[in-house]
Amino acid sequence: MGMFQVKVQVANPDDPKRSFEELFWVDTGALYSYVPGKRLEEIGLTSIRSRKLVLADGRHETRQLGEARFTIDELNETLTCPVIFGPDDSLYLLGATALENFGVDADPTIKKLKPVAAIIGGFLASR
């Protein structure tokens, strides 16, 4: 068991040719995906709002949030996902929001993303 990485292409939704590929750590404990801000700015992404965050070490921080087109290599699918502009030396993290958007869950035993059935609204939606 343990952490694993997947290859992700990150693109500007307004100009998809402006993009980069990187290995992202799959992090189900992170709500948002996290990318060094400089890399996002290089492809022309701008923030749409700020978000207060609690980091893994317990520190509180306010960071900028934007939206990017993510293509996860092993899924061969592209969706727009929220992304945090991290410090320039930060790790590349694929967070829970992106995983849910793609309808996948992390399976650390085989180090792969696996499809899951989406739950819509619980009890109220089933009425």
Q: Where are the regions that the model predicts?
A:
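Pepsin/retropepsin-fold aspartyl endopeptidases
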Residues: 1-127
